[in-house]
Amino acid sequence: MKEILYRRSIQDTVRIKGIGLHSGKEVNLTAHPAPSGTGIVFEYRKGLEKASISAELSNVVDTSNATTLGDGIHKIQTVEHLLAAVYALGLTDLILEIDAVEVPIMDGSSLPFLQALESAGIIEYPEIVEPIYIQSPLWVVDGDKYLVLLPSDELKVTYTIDFNHPLLKGQSITVSLDREKIKQEILPARTFGFLKDVEALQARGLAMGGSLDNAIVLTQDGYLNQQLRFENECVRHKILDLFGDISIAGRPIIGHYLASKAGHALDISMAKLVMSNVTGDEISKYKSRRIPLFKRKAVVV
């Protein structure tokens, strides 16, 4: 029997402080509880400037190097690591107040966000979230890059990265996942980059907050970092990005993801493809017959 999922928020307000990857400047992020049905909403507050941007597919304005949400005037960059933690906790309703245009990079993974949000406590609402179960294959392709979604009653990912580097040539992983496994096996994986690219970006005034404290940095033939959290940490981080991006659909999308050299653009394209078919014959929703017959109140979990 498939798991019944309910809308969730946090119990208490929690504050998170870090630096922006590109600006190198301090960022203050405050997560607030929100009523059921609110969704995940970023509230930008900087002096007299204010903006409210929901984490929705229609608000994705850029997928180059990171995922950016915007309203046509304001933007919030690098949302995927935070949203991956939100996804793993099953949170559906949050106000995320931020005083900068990019989410803090923290240690380059989702772990600090996970720990902060968990420390605030989780409350579960009586309203049900309906996962989407794929009945026929879906795919998005860009040259030699692809992301395929196959029918499966469990969440599963097969991911391959293939960089021109001896340690990242054909690095691959297949994992079956649930919320707890995502927390333990995916969210601690840090972002990665190549030393030559970091130096070029910093020469242009970008990646000013990048360091060995918040990224895996690869030299021509090895790692600058002394220790990895996983032997295949880089490909695991790509799965982290995938979940952060797919979460913007607003409902869990269950299936077997097959990815090769994919990234934010294909992740978002897949989420849009799924949601465009959500009322069609290709998609099976979580049917109402699985809703309990008794009335359920909000509970702390």
UniProtKB/Swiss-Prot annotation:
Gene3D superfamilies for this protein = lpxc deacetylase, domain 1 (3.30.230.20), lpxc deacetylase, domain 2 (3.30.1700.10)
Q: In which pathway does it act?
A: Glycolipid biosynthesis; lipid IV(A) biosynthesis; lipid IV(A) from (3R)-3-hydroxytetradecanoyl-[acyl-carrier-protein] and UDP-N-acetyl-alpha-D-glucosamine: step 2/6
Which keywords belong to this entry? Hydrolase, Lipid A biosynthesis, Lipid biosynthesis, Lipid metabolism, Metal-binding, Zinc
Please provide, alphabetically and separated by semicolons, the GO molecular function terms listed in this UniProt record. Answer: metal ion binding; UDP-3-O-acyl-N-acetylglucosamine deacetylase activity
Q: Which cofactor does it need?
A: Zn(2+)
GO cellular component terms? membrane
Q: List the disulfide bonds.
A: none
Q: What is its EC number?
A: 3.5.1.108
* Record's keyword annotation contains Transmembrane helix: no
Q: Active site located where?
A: H264
- Record field: catalytic activity: a UDP-3-O-[(3R)-3-hydroxyacyl]-N-acetyl-alpha-D-glucosamine + H2O = a UDP-3-O-[(3R)-3-hydroxyacyl]-alpha-D-glucosamine + acetate
**UniProt-listed Pfam families:** LpxC
Q: Name one GO biological process term.
A: lipid A biosynthetic process
Top-level taxon of origin: Bacteria
Q: Where does Zn(2+) bind?
A: H81, H237, D241
User: Does Ribonucleoprotein show up as a keyword for this record?
Assistant: no
Family assignment? Belongs to the LpxC family.
In UniProt terms, what function does this protein have? Catalyzes the hydrolysis of UDP-3-O-myristoyl-N-acetylglucosamine to form UDP-3-O-myristoylglucosamine and acetate, the committed step in lipid A biosynthesis.
What is the protein's name according to its record? UDP-3-O-acyl-N-acetylglucosamine deacetylase
Organism of provenance: Leptospira interrogans serogroup Icterohaemorrhagiae serovar Lai (strain 56601)
